[in-house]
Amino acid sequence: RKKISTDTLEKIIYAISNASTYDEIRDIIKNAKIYESQKVILIKVLRANSLSDDARHTLAKKLVEAEENRFGKKIERTDIVTRIGPTLGLMGTLIPMGPGLAALGVGDVNTLASAIIVAFDTTVVGVGSGAVAYFVSKVRRRWYEEYLSDLDALVDTVLDKLKN
């Protein structure tokens, strides 16, 4: 992941705003130090210069929404692990406890001990996987929000330039 600094974003916005031709804007976008996927979306918006302002704005909005949906699907995976991991850990705790308690009833302490070991191991794995997935989701969500914020600013700049 590469981080786009505010200074870099500002330079790109000024360059697009001060560009005088379609080709100049396209070259600025192609040479910008931004993600390739952002360049693709910006070029699509730029190519829509023959559309009305409203149609171009609608297209840009749909392109950004599609990008948001793409990132949402990626985050869903780790969000699912965040919730399922601890649930499976709890199930792994409760399931071996039944035979362990039954073994305790007949005086078999060794079976109880091994059941408790399995129960606690699965609890730790479940909670651990949930914690790792939660951390990954939070970091990814922040990255994607920055990406989309940058994309939104750049799309607005291109739309504004095409309007003038």
Residue ranges and their predicted role:
Residues 1-8:
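Hydrophobic membrane-targeting segments
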Residues 9-85, 141-164:
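Predominantly long cytosolic amphipathic alpha-helical stalk/bundle segments
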Residues 74-128:
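Helix-termination/interfacial motifs at the ends of transmembrane alpha-helices
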